[in-house]
């Protein structure tokens, strides 16, 4: 009997040892997403559901509200989800059912909307989260809130350019002759869900145009990476020779959006886009560095290794090279996770969002259900 117990304990020990070695090899460090989420709420969220950016005088954006909806939905935190959406609706809603993108303190010290223009990426994320909440929690109120927003996105934030319908960055930009486009706003998985609940519009056309323009604009950069912004003028795609034409803090989200669509649907058009992470895999293997800001001509803009961008890249890199993804994760992500539940800079709101999203996706979870 004693021998049997010893054998059992020995087998358990060996199993634990093997798992520990495998975890170390493949980057399974089980960083506590709940702990990070709670720290995020403590650091950024007011009692009434407003997300504040400490690096921008505690201002609030529709993007920040949307990101908190994504996180709270992913962790099944209905109470926080409702709190954040209620604040968003009460304080950022426009007459057309979209949301003002910037809210904060004016020159007189009064808190109000500072810029009433919309931001289509946030509007899309909010509507998507409401539909996802409806499906997850089976509450009709979320569907009733989502449908008018979806219709307003179509009516106010899309524009036909030649043979293609394109997503505009906001309401004001739809009236300009020179069309400015942010490709990181393209959200094919959201458009597919909108189609499910809106049979009046062809949202699949917007899926198609998203992939068309992503492919077209990425073919014009030497790195093959998407730019932060591009222009459409006289039917031609133009990438500006400035930071707006760089692959940087905005453009990194293209990988999040396309990866999410690929994981949900297996979309074949996503593959050539996601394969561009091989650029970073090659850089890592030769330099052990992962610089994240590149000009469209292929040259480095600077030697910034923005940890938020790296976090978004790792799940995509994992599709093509698990070993390299694990190396980067161990070297560039794990050391920055603080005991208080935040990564690297406690006050960098944008980096902490991207880090949380990247970590969630890297640990084989579907961020956007």
What residue spans do the PLM features occupy?
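N-terminal Sec-pathway targeting helices
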Residues: 1-12
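Low-complexity, Ser/Thr/Pro/Gly-enriched N-terminal "stalk/linker" regions
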Residues: 19-63, 73-107, 112-113, 162-169, ...
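Extended ligand-binding clefts on enzyme/binding-domain cores
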Residues: 26-31, 35, 58-62, 143-323, ...
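Second-shell loop/turn segments in exported
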Residues: 54-58, 70-74, 113-117, 136-138, ...
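Aromatic-rich carbohydrate-recognition surfaces in CAZymes
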Residues: 58-65, 113-134
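Short glycine/serine- and small hydrophobic-enriched flexible loop segments
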Residues: 69-76, 125-135, 189-196, 256-260, ...
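Inward-facing hydrophobic residues that define packing positions of alpha-helical scaffold repeats
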Residues: 85, 130, 143-146, 150, ...
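C-terminal functional modules
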Residues: 298-369
